[in-house]
Amino acid sequence: MILSIESSCDDSSIAITEIKTNKLIYHKKISQELQHSIYGGVVPELAARLHVEALPKILEECKEYFPLLKAIAVTNAPGLSVTLMEGVTMAKALSISLNLPLIAVNHLKGHIYSLFIEKQEVLPITILLVSGGHTQIIEANSLNDMKVVATTIDDSFGESFDKVSKMLGLGYPGGPVVQEYSLKGDVNRFDLPIPLSQSPKIEFSYSGLKNAVRLHIEKLENSEEGIREQDKYDICASFQKTAVDHIMQKLKKQFKQKVPKNFAIVGGASANIYLRTQIDELCKKHNMNLYLSELKYCSDNAAMIGRVAVEQYKLKDFISIEEIDIQTRIKEF
């Protein structure tokens, strides 16, 4: 068994995964959404302090499995430096005290392997990764052969939902609330520009779309009636459709070059139902197999880290206590 730790942002999570069967023996996550919501986003120092409180509590529940463990795995990149450090510090201490090898896991590979929790790998596969920090198209041939073929030039899909929600005073995290508000809105009321629609390049951008939404909100706020609840519904609906349309346009261009046999969407923002529906239709049109993470595994969790760690364990991909470090960003897989 492998004990895995996730603390890259605002979720404290520990899991135990069986190596031979990929079975998830134990998994628990403590979210910090409530504590950060009053600030409209994640406060790194607060997140780190909350990890200090939560991780030991979760670990206490796992002690019965310690004699069965073969390795300790931990997310070491990418993420917030102060929160990554809490997980890595715990992992190093466990590695030393239990005399077990240490496995450093790429958080983004974790999101990809969230598709395979308690399942076998399906490779090669092309993946759309959408989260608060990333919007990427990735071609994965194996665990150690992954290539980013498209990325954002500024902001991410998930971050734009958080920003729109904040501008409308709807709270954090923005993804679920914007999705909920959009159900009551008119997608055609506000004419929002689809980013990079005239560009032949396969890349993403959300800064311009966020600015366009901001201008509509300011215009409504300065009107005699002010901004009404229905206005918020309509803005959310128009924004969500445009944000997803942008992704769909770029995916269609990508598929003109190469149609993969297997396609997947992963990351916290992949829980968006409208995005899932649009991609499902596109995959059916191109006869592609579509793979989706279970909704409970879309956001950050240690189960996906453990699933990657199983494959790294088989390859004896270990790292020493002295060598492991944290990285807030990574350029390639």
Swiss-Prot record:
<keyword id="KW-0479">Metal-binding</keyword>
<feature type="binding site">
    <location>
        <position position="272"/>
    </location>
    <ligand>
        <name>substrate</name>
    </ligand>
</feature>
<comment type="similarity">
    <text>Belongs to the KAE1 / TsaD family.</text>
</comment>
<feature type="binding site">
    <location>
        <begin position="129"/>
        <end position="133"/>
    </location>
    <ligand>
        <name>substrate</name>
    </ligand>
</feature>
<dbReference type="InterPro" id="IPR022450">
    <property type="entry name" value="TsaD"/>
</dbReference>
<feature type="binding site">
    <location>
        <position position="111"/>
    </location>
    <ligand>
        <name>Fe cation</name>
    </ligand>
</feature>
<feature type="binding site">
    <location>
        <position position="300"/>
    </location>
    <ligand>
        <name>Fe cation</name>
    </ligand>
</feature>
<keyword id="KW-0408">Iron</keyword>
<dbReference type="Pfam" id="PF00814">
    <property type="entry name" value="TsaD"/>
</dbReference>
<dbReference type="InterPro" id="IPR017861">
    <property type="entry name" value="KAE1/TsaD"/>
</dbReference>
<keyword id="KW-0808">Transferase</keyword>
<dbReference type="InterPro" id="IPR043129">
    <property type="entry name" value="ATPase_NBD"/>
</dbReference>
<dbReference type="GO" id="GO:0005737">
    <property type="term" value="C:cytoplasm"/>
</dbReference>
<keyword id="KW-0819">tRNA processing</keyword>
<keyword id="KW-0963">Cytoplasm</keyword>
<dbReference type="GO" id="GO:0005506">
    <property type="term" value="F:iron ion binding"/>
</dbReference>
<feature type="binding site">
    <location>
        <position position="175"/>
    </location>
    <ligand>
        <name>substrate</name>
    </ligand>
</feature>
<feature type="binding site">
    <location>
        <position position="162"/>
    </location>
    <ligand>
        <name>substrate</name>
    </ligand>
</feature>
<feature type="binding site">
    <location>
        <position position="107"/>
    </location>
    <ligand>
        <name>Fe cation</name>
    </ligand>
</feature>
<dbReference type="InterPro" id="IPR000905">
    <property type="entry name" value="Gcp-like_dom"/>
</dbReference>
<protein>
    <recommendedName>
        <fullName>tRNA N6-adenosine threonylcarbamoyltransferase</fullName>
        <ecNumber>2.3.1.234</ecNumber>
    </recommendedName>
</protein>
<dbReference type="GO" id="GO:0061711">
    <property type="term" value="F:N(6)-L-threonylcarbamoyladenine synthase activity"/>
</dbReference>
<dbReference type="InterPro" id="IPR017860">
    <property type="entry name" value="Peptidase_M22_CS"/>
</dbReference>
<comment type="function">
    <text>Required for the formation of a threonylcarbamoyl group on adenosine at position 37 (t(6)A37) in tRNAs that read codons beginning with adenine. Is involved in the transfer of the threonylcarbamoyl moiety of threonylcarbamoyl-AMP (TC-AMP) to the N6 group of A37, together with TsaE and TsaB. TsaD likely plays a direct catalytic role in this reaction.</text>
</comment>
<dbReference type="GO" id="GO:0002949">
    <property type="term" value="P:tRNA threonylcarbamoyladenosine modification"/>
</dbReference>
<keyword id="KW-0012">Acyltransferase</keyword>
